[in-house]
Design a protein with these regions (language model features):
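Non-catalytic accessory regions of SAM-dependent methyltransferases
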Residues: 1-46, 95-97
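Non-catalytic substrate-recognition/targeting regions of SAM-dependent transferases
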Residues: 36, 40-43, 59-121, 127
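Conserved class I S-adenosyl-L-methionine
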Residues: 134-141
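Solvent-exposed alpha-helices and their adjacent loops that cap or buttress functional pockets
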Residues: 130-132
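Cysteine-centered catalytic environments shared across enzyme families
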Residues: 2-24, 53-55, 61-80
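Pocket-edge structural micro-motifs
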Residues: 31-33, 53, 109-111
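Metal-dependent phosphodiester-processing active-site neighborhood
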Residues: 127-128, 141
Length: 141
Protein backbone atom coordinates (compact mmCIF):
# COMPACT_ATOMS: atom_id res chain seq x y z
CA UNK A 1 0.00 0.00 0.00
CA UNK A 2 1.70 3.15 -1.25
CA UNK A 3 0.34 5.64 1.29
CA UNK A 4 0.84 3.38 4.33
CA UNK A 5 4.07 5.10 5.51
CA UNK A 6 2.39 8.50 5.27
CA UNK A 7 -0.63 7.30 7.28
CA UNK A 8 1.60 5.93 10.04
CA UNK A 9 3.85 9.02 10.10
CA UNK A 10 0.81 11.29 10.30
CA UNK A 11 -0.61 9.26 13.19
CA UNK A 12 2.77 9.40 14.96
CA UNK A 13 2.94 13.19 14.56
CA UNK A 14 -0.63 13.60 15.83
CA UNK A 15 0.39 11.89 19.06
CA UNK A 16 3.28 14.25 19.81
CA UNK A 17 1.79 15.18 23.20
CA UNK A 18 1.70 11.51 24.20
CA UNK A 19 5.32 10.99 23.13
CA UNK A 20 6.41 13.81 25.42
CA UNK A 21 4.08 13.06 28.35
CA UNK A 22 5.78 12.17 31.62
CA UNK A 23 4.58 8.89 33.08
CA UNK A 24 3.08 7.78 29.77
CA UNK A 25 4.89 5.43 27.42
CA UNK A 26 1.98 3.20 26.47
CA UNK A 27 -0.69 4.14 23.93
CA UNK A 28 -2.12 3.37 20.52
CA UNK A 29 0.06 4.83 17.77
CA UNK A 30 -2.24 3.92 14.91
CA UNK A 31 -5.94 3.08 15.05
CA UNK A 32 -6.71 1.71 11.61
CA UNK A 33 -10.46 2.20 11.68
CA UNK A 34 -10.23 5.93 12.33
CA UNK A 35 -7.03 6.50 10.34
CA UNK A 36 -8.00 4.96 7.04
CA UNK A 37 -6.92 1.34 7.29
CA UNK A 38 -9.41 -0.81 9.24
CA UNK A 39 -7.88 -3.88 10.85
CA UNK A 40 -4.43 -2.40 11.41
CA UNK A 41 -3.61 -1.24 14.93
CA UNK A 42 -0.18 -0.33 16.24
CA UNK A 43 0.33 -0.01 19.98
CA UNK A 44 3.33 1.37 21.81
CA UNK A 45 4.41 -0.28 25.04
CA UNK A 46 7.53 1.70 26.05
CA UNK A 47 10.20 0.68 23.52
CA UNK A 48 8.03 -2.06 22.01
CA UNK A 49 5.61 -1.71 19.09
CA UNK A 50 2.85 -4.30 18.64
CA UNK A 51 1.36 -4.47 15.16
CA UNK A 52 -2.08 -6.14 15.10
CA UNK A 53 -3.17 -6.77 11.54
CA UNK A 54 -5.23 -8.92 9.19
CA UNK A 55 -3.41 -11.55 7.13
CA UNK A 56 -3.92 -9.39 4.02
CA UNK A 57 -1.36 -6.89 5.36
CA UNK A 58 1.37 -9.50 5.89
CA UNK A 59 3.32 -8.32 2.82
CA UNK A 60 3.35 -4.75 4.19
CA UNK A 61 5.08 -5.62 7.49
CA UNK A 62 8.53 -4.65 6.18
CA UNK A 63 7.22 -1.20 5.21
CA UNK A 64 5.37 -0.81 8.53
CA UNK A 65 8.49 -1.81 10.50
CA UNK A 66 10.74 0.59 8.57
CA UNK A 67 8.24 3.43 9.04
CA UNK A 68 8.00 2.78 12.78
CA UNK A 69 11.79 2.80 13.07
CA UNK A 70 11.89 6.14 11.24
CA UNK A 71 9.53 7.50 13.90
CA UNK A 72 11.20 5.99 16.99
CA UNK A 73 14.04 3.63 17.86
CA UNK A 74 11.92 0.70 19.03
CA UNK A 75 13.91 -2.13 20.62
CA UNK A 76 11.23 -4.69 19.82
CA UNK A 77 8.62 -4.82 17.06
CA UNK A 78 6.08 -7.64 17.15
CA UNK A 79 3.60 -8.71 14.48
CA UNK A 80 0.30 -10.03 15.84
CA UNK A 81 -1.70 -11.34 12.88
CA UNK A 82 -5.35 -12.09 13.55
CA UNK A 83 -5.88 -15.67 14.76
CA UNK A 84 -2.16 -16.51 14.49
CA UNK A 85 0.74 -16.51 16.95
CA UNK A 86 2.79 -13.36 17.43
CA UNK A 87 6.14 -13.07 15.67
CA UNK A 88 9.16 -10.87 16.45
CA UNK A 89 10.03 -8.64 13.49
CA UNK A 90 12.84 -6.72 15.20
CA UNK A 91 14.74 -7.32 18.41
CA UNK A 92 14.74 -10.27 20.74
CA UNK A 93 11.73 -11.81 22.45
CA UNK A 94 11.80 -10.89 26.14
CA UNK A 95 12.14 -13.67 28.70
CA UNK A 96 10.44 -11.67 31.45
CA UNK A 97 7.45 -9.29 31.33
CA UNK A 98 8.17 -5.72 30.19
CA UNK A 99 7.41 -2.81 32.51
CA UNK A 100 5.43 0.06 30.99
CA UNK A 101 3.79 3.25 32.28
CA UNK A 102 0.22 4.31 31.73
CA UNK A 103 -0.82 7.50 33.51
CA UNK A 104 2.13 7.12 35.93
CA UNK A 105 1.01 3.58 36.87
CA UNK A 106 3.42 0.70 36.28
CA UNK A 107 2.17 -2.38 34.47
CA UNK A 108 3.86 -5.51 33.25
CA UNK A 109 3.04 -6.81 29.80
CA UNK A 110 3.95 -9.84 27.76
CA UNK A 111 4.18 -8.67 24.13
CA UNK A 112 4.15 -12.15 22.60
CA UNK A 113 1.14 -13.40 24.55
CA UNK A 114 -2.31 -13.52 22.95
CA UNK A 115 -3.27 -10.82 25.47
CA UNK A 116 -0.36 -8.55 26.43
CA UNK A 117 -1.96 -7.86 29.82
CA UNK A 118 -3.01 -4.22 29.42
CA UNK A 119 -5.98 -2.97 27.42
CA UNK A 120 -5.15 0.50 26.13
CA UNK A 121 -8.82 1.26 25.46
CA UNK A 122 -9.50 1.05 29.20
CA UNK A 123 -7.32 4.08 30.06
CA UNK A 124 -10.34 6.31 30.90
CA UNK A 125 -11.57 3.71 33.39
CA UNK A 126 -8.12 3.40 34.96
CA UNK A 127 -7.91 7.20 35.20
CA UNK A 128 -11.29 7.35 36.94
CA UNK A 129 -10.30 4.54 39.27
CA UNK A 130 -7.04 6.27 40.16
CA UNK A 131 -8.93 9.49 40.96
CA UNK A 132 -11.47 7.70 43.16
CA UNK A 133 -9.35 5.12 44.95
CA UNK A 134 -6.69 7.05 46.85
CA UNK A 135 -5.45 5.12 49.89
CA UNK A 136 -7.40 2.03 48.84
CA UNK A 137 -6.34 -1.35 47.55
CA UNK A 138 -7.84 -2.52 44.26
CA UNK A 139 -8.39 -6.13 43.23
CA UNK A 140 -8.16 -6.58 39.48
CA UNK A 141 -10.06 -9.72 38.51
Amino acid sequence: MADLPQLIQKAWQQRALLHAAAGQNTYRIFHGFSEGLPGLNIDRYATTALISHPAALHDDLTIITATLLNCHSFDLIVSRPQKQPAKVLRGTAPTIPLEVLDNHIKFQIEPLAANPGLYLDARPVRTWLKQHSENRRILNL
